[in-house]
Amino acid sequence: MVKGVKGRPNVLAIVLAGGEGKRLFPLTEDRAKPAVPFGGTYRLIDFVLSNLVNSGFLKIAVLTQYKSHSLDRHISLSWNVSGPTGQYIASVPAQQRLGKRWFTGSADAILQSLNLISDEKPDYVIVFGADHVYRMDPSQMLDEHIASGRAVSVAGIRVPREEATAFGCIQSDDDGNITEFLEKPADPPGTPDDPDMTYASMGNYIFTTEALIQALKDDENNENSDHDMGGDIIPYFVSRNDAHVYDFSGNIVPGATERDKGYWRDVGTIDAFYECHMDLISVHPIFNLYNSEWPIHTTSEGNLPPAKFVRGGIAQSSMVSSGSIISAGTVRNSVLSNNVVVEEGATVEGAVLMPGVRIGKGAVVRHAILDKNVVVRDGELIGVDHVRDAQRFKVSAGGVVVVGKNQVV
């Protein structure tokens, strides 16, 4: 692990957390995508922050912009690691240091925050996204980046070629040098050792600091640039033969099983978000939340009582978080966040219920996601009458009904 001890490089981690997440609407109607609750007790940003902290990186700047109040509050309450040793996880909003404008792209976000780099004077800068579900030890990627001698390393995950058209794709030679970076290509390139697989970019990068600063300044003066890390900065280095691919399949996380090794999910759509939750409650989930050797950290639930099941209330094949009460109701194949109440005769099946949701007596909720503080009236049906659902709520391509935050239905 890289812990900033004597003889180790000085590293600053920057987490890009300003994403709007339009494809997750209405879950992102009132919050930034990285702040969306996940897995009962977490938020999406907890995964990248846990990976960095577990790996020993404790100088972390989280760049925020879009509807960031929930995210800022979560970071301040859950991720307070500041101390006399210079460790911190800080939420950094758009500061308009280069004029009265917001971030125009992910590269522009870092350009406008170069003061963070000049203050820390790091040898290397980690730039990771904030909205994926995975475990990773970034220190292993840093070690390989240093050994490569390149200006940037891009984390690549192996995906079948036919599934890679939705990603930024990496073509590399046998030595890991990136020869081409293609955005959502119709014919993705194979990996050097397997023509049926493609390196898809995970949106995680490690830069040698001086090279990153120069690239950002050159990009600022490029009128044809969209000022995007994946779309502009990485191709900038590829064109200079100065980019390396890091094969994520070789990343070894303590406590990982063969089943969840190399797991990484983009939960940027309602269906992907829902399916990822359904995996969590399976008997043998691909992604194991219960790995104590590489924990996913979040707000302590020490002040909440345990979940309670009364008057014959039951939960089968489900995750039920602290403070929740199931009173003579039935929950199956569902994920319940904190302080959820399921009342007498209610049925919840195949659902994701976020904090504070209340399901009234005799109500039925199926194949649905209910955002924070939704109240379902007695006898109401959700996920039963598809025509009526479509008239009232968003329904995904996969048929998942989504009820937005604070609604009473």
UniProtKB/Swiss-Prot annotation:
Pathway assignment: Glycan biosynthesis; glycogen biosynthesis
A Pfam family this chain is assigned to: NTP_transferase
InterPro entries in the record: ADP-Glc_PPase (IPR011831), ADP_Glu_pyroP_CS (IPR005836), GlgC_bac (IPR023049), GlmU/GlgC-like_hexapep (IPR056818), NTP_transferase_dom (IPR005835), Nucleotide-diphossugar_trans (IPR029044), Trimer_LpxA-like_sf (IPR011004)
This protein's record includes keyword NADP: no
Its EC number(s): 2.7.7.27
Annotated PANTHER family: GLUCOSE-1-PHOSPHATE ADENYLYLTRANSFERASE, GLUCOSE-1-PHOSPHATE ADENYLYLTRANSFERASE-RELATED
Subunit details: Homotetramer.
Protein name, as recorded: Glucose-1-phosphate adenylyltransferase
Lineage per the UniProt record: Bacteria, Bacillati, Actinomycetota, Actinomycetes, Mycobacteriales
